[in-house]
């Protein structure tokens, strides 16, 4: 979530999620315990879960967790417990969760929110607040101490979300995929393109690199277009390596996705990357999303870096200039 710190107030301005049935298809009552790094998006996560239909409680004392869960009766719960919480202990929280998971009527999951040290420091600088574990010391000291303290919880979490590169909309989309209450047990797939120069999406479950395909960037007529435009799509689709690659990709996914679903996974992110995130990856991601829909999956599609401003293009490599002079028709 670059650009602004995560707070309940900033999350309130995002599009609301869709609340639905109280229980998922298996009939168990959902309980989501939200923890993680201070500044990593805990408040935003609780607000998003509340919009999905959960009753949200923040900064609950650990000693009250079990009592609250059973006093809530039929309601799905989202409970924030983190290092600010009075009597907080990672080991004690894990013991409480194990005890709750022993109840057959509950589906208890641990959600861990985090971000990189650089992003966390920037968020604290923007809010001018001290770190809760380093009130009279530099913020980096508090971040390092908290990350060490929370290692057991991160390792035990069913869902880990790194918000470093995510917008609030992205976080809400991921939370909706993992924790929706519509009773639909099927696997939802989100396909996104991205630029390697801006980093691999941290939320991706599967990543595929299409930088081996011929790059439309070197054709001046195609450079300002995107992989959603027909001329670029035709250019990439004509690459002799594309048909075999796409066939192998779908052959891999065809048996893999049902296995994910059988293991209880409800949300899967597939990321397709190229250098600039505008041509090859966009076309391939769009093509893959269409194939997945044809297979009956519920599919979301995004293109992370499509509208990102890029630096001025570098000169074409010498071999590309020679080839262009000799066979200009191949690069129109």
UniProtKB/Swiss-Prot annotation:
The keyword Nucleotide-binding applies. GO terms for molecular function: ATP binding; GTP binding. GTP binds at residues 82-85. ATP binds at residues 36-43. Residues 10-22 have a biased composition (Low complexity). It holds the Pfam family RapZ-like_N. Residues 302-312, 322-332 have a biased composition (Basic and acidic residues). Keywords: ATP-binding, GTP-binding, Nucleotide-binding. Residues 1-27, 302-332 are annotated as: Disordered. PANTHER family: RNASE ADAPTER PROTEIN RAPZ (PTHR30448:SF0). Displays ATPase and GTPase activities. Belongs to the RapZ-like family. This is Nucleotide-binding protein RC1_2868. It comes from Rhodospirillum centenum (strain ATCC 51521 / SW).
């Amino acid at each position: 979530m670059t650009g602004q710190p995560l707070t309940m107030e900033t999350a309130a301005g995002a599009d609301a999620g869709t609340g639905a049935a109280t229980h998922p298809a298996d009939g168990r009552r959902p309980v989501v315990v939200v923890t993680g790094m201070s500044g990593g998006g805990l408040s935003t996560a609780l607000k998003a879960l509340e919009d999905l239909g959960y009753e949200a409680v923040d900064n609950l004392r650990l000693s009250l967790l079990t009592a609250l869960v059973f006093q809530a009766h039929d309601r799905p719960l989202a409970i924030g417990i983190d290092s600010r919480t009075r009597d907080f202990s990672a080991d004690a929280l894990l013991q409480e969760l194990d005890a709750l998971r022993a109840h057959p009527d509950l589906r208890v999951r641990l959600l861990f929110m985090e971000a990189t040290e650089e992003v966390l420091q920037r968020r604290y600088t923007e809010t001018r607040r001290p770190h809760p574990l380093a009130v009279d010391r530099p913020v980096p000291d508090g971040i390092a101490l908290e990350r060490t303290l929370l290692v057991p919880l991160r390792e035990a979490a069913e869902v880990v979300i790194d918000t470093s590169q995510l917008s609030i909309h992205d976080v809400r989309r991921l939370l909706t995929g993992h924790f929706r209450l519509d009773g639909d047990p099927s696997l939802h797939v989100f396909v996104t393109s991205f630029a390697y120069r801006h980093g691999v999406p941290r939320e991706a479950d599967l990543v595929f690199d299409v930088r081996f395909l011929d790059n439309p960037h070197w054709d001046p007529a195609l450079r300002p277009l995107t992989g959603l435009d027909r001329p670029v799509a035709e250019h990439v689709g004509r690459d002799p390596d594309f048909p075999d690659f796409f066939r192998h990709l779908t052959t891999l996914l065809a048996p893999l996705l049902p296995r994910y679903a059988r293991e209880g996974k409800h949300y899967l992110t597939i990321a397709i990357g190229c250098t600039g995130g505008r041509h090859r990856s966009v076309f391939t991601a769009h093509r893959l999303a269409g194939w997945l829909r044809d297979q009956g999956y519920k599919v979301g599609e995004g293109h992370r870096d499509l509208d990102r401003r890029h630096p001025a293009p570098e000169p074409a490599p010498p071999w590309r200039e020679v080839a262009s002079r000799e066979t200009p028709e191949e690069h129109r």
